[in-house]
Amino acid sequence: GKAAVREFYEKLGKKYVKALDDMIVLDALICNTDRHYGNFGFLVNNKTNKIVAPAPLFDHGNSLYNFAGRDDLESYDAFSQYADTLLPCVYDDFILEAKKVLTKEHKEHLRKLLQFKFKKHSRYNLPDQRLKYLEKRIHERVQMLLQ
């Protein structure tokens, strides 16, 4: 389980634990519901088969409320009700788990997100209302993490 994962990362060293903690905090922020034991990654030297670094963060496809349907987007209350049903795969609560590993550095980065706004792309965008709901939810999750 998650204790064995943390123990493994701790045996690898501080930079690995930092990467694990960064992943937990990001997953809490974006509500990544698909972090499972098959996607904790490492970079491996293909000649020696030795772990050389934590992998960059990956597999965030099931995050930012990507399965919210039309009914969930009718109002912010409906969106919040939908969002509140989402749970992580490998622990019980996104925010509580992230708070366990939150560092001063994480808090500094999170504070910068209190005013976060999506920058619209010239061609590829979600509907304005959905982006507004996502921004508001990110702000709320930042506040929950910082409390």
Question: Model segments located where?
Answer:
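Phosphate/dinucleotide-binding and metal-coordinating scaffold of catalytic cores
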Residues: 1-25, 29-32, 37, 42-147
